[in-house]
Amino acid sequence: MSTSFENKATNRGVITFTISQDKIKPALDQAFNKIKKDLNAPGFRKGHMPRPVFNQRFGEEVLYEEALNIVLPAAYEGAVAELELDVVAQPKIDVVSMEKGQEWTLTAEVVTKPEVKLGDYKDLTVEVEASKEVTDEEVDAKVERERNNLAELVVKEEAAVEGDTVVIDFVGSVDGVEFDGGKGDNFSLELGSGQFIPGFEEQLVGAKAGDTVEVNVTFPENYQAEDLAGKAAKFVTTVHEVKAKEVPELDDELAKDIDEEVETLDELKAKYRKELEASKEAAYDDALEGAAIELAVENAEIVELPEEMVHDEVHRSVNEFMASMQRQGISPDMYFQLTGTSQEDLHKQHEAEADKRVKTNLVIEAIAKAEGFEASDDEIEKEINDLAAEYSMPVEQVRSLLSADMLKHDIVMKKAVEVITSSAKAK
């Protein structure tokens, strides 16, 4: 196979490559065996037409397209490897010549990975907004959250105040006409929770059990039900019960109810302080790492980032997002209806982050190359075992899912990130 590359513009060019007859002939045989199963011809059983008869009747050229589909992937990848090109995005393939008995000649318009001119990426000094310090107020707030989780709702006779829960029936109408979804029975609503549209909950403050309250509200302009958006509505609301939140005493017994491993409130607070310190330390390290990587990317120059790279990353990101929505039972149509957005809007929302990720990956890859990082067999094996432990999967299953090249790439990328972050300091 002969190959050549002609540079057309920055990060763009055309590969010309040939496919030899020793590759074409087996591909033609495979193509014939694939289509002959459906062939009918006088004097032959279905699927048993001899090759010479086929060639005479239809011509060998009929097989060329199928044969090309068979032989092209390996031929193209071989040409890219021989030319040592770092290609991104899908190529545009054109046939130059496909003559019988001759080698085939093709071209591939390709986009290549851009050059990265690295700036400073070691000993960086960065702004880090996160703090490692844990205050008494943060510890007390965590205890208070757990205390509130153990609160009980107790029926009271007094008027409802914000934070109380009311059990209500309601019937909604617009211009005197009831609408779908505007009716509820024995609904528990915490006042101040923001569960209902703005203005609804506030009008139930002061109500008592047995009261009927006429709640007047206006649906937001961006309300998901377009036929109700911006319209004034009336909800006739009957209050059946008012319940107050009763929290337990803040003492050692509460501490033991929250965590059976402690005996006193002081022990619980000490445990929470240690947990918060570990959490804030991790958050600080993440913030330092993120800021250092961001500065290393800013310090580098990427020579004409191909739009195809960002476009592909946007598609990958959107597909991943929609897959996560579908796992939650939300179809694409349902998502766009609920959010009032379109496929185009979603792509635009992902563009900035996609652009940032592509640039970041390019710079980290360039650092790994500049540092001469490689991945040893032992490091690959450790990575497989670590992933198996992290995701509770058999080692062999992880090995079958991830190629050696993917694992090597991940390992050298981690090494490059470590080079950036290990010497970075906060201002």
Swiss-Prot record:
GO MF entry, a single one: protein folding chaperone
Cellular compartment(s): Cytoplasm
GO-annotated biological processes: 'de novo' cotranslational protein folding; cell division; chaperone-mediated protein folding; protein transport; protein unfolding
Highest taxon above the source species: Bacteria
GO annotation, cellular component aspect: cytoplasm
Catalytic activity: [protein]-peptidylproline (omega=180) = [protein]-peptidylproline (omega=0)
UniProt KW keywords: Cell cycle, Cell division, Chaperone, Cytoplasm, Isomerase, Rotamase
Chief location bin: cytoplasm
Domain PPIase FKBP-type: 163-248
EC number(s) reported in the record: 5.2.1.8
Family assignment from sequence similarity: Belongs to the FKBP-type PPIase family. Tig subfamily.
Biological function: Involved in protein export. Acts as a chaperone by maintaining the newly synthesized protein in an open conformation. Functions as a peptidyl-prolyl cis-trans isomerase.
Comment, domains: Consists of 3 domains; the N-terminus binds the ribosome, the middle domain has PPIase activity, while the C-terminus has intrinsic chaperone activity on its own.
UniProt-recorded name of the protein: Trigger factor
Gene source species: Streptococcus equi subsp. zooepidemicus (strain MGCS10565)
Record gene name: tig
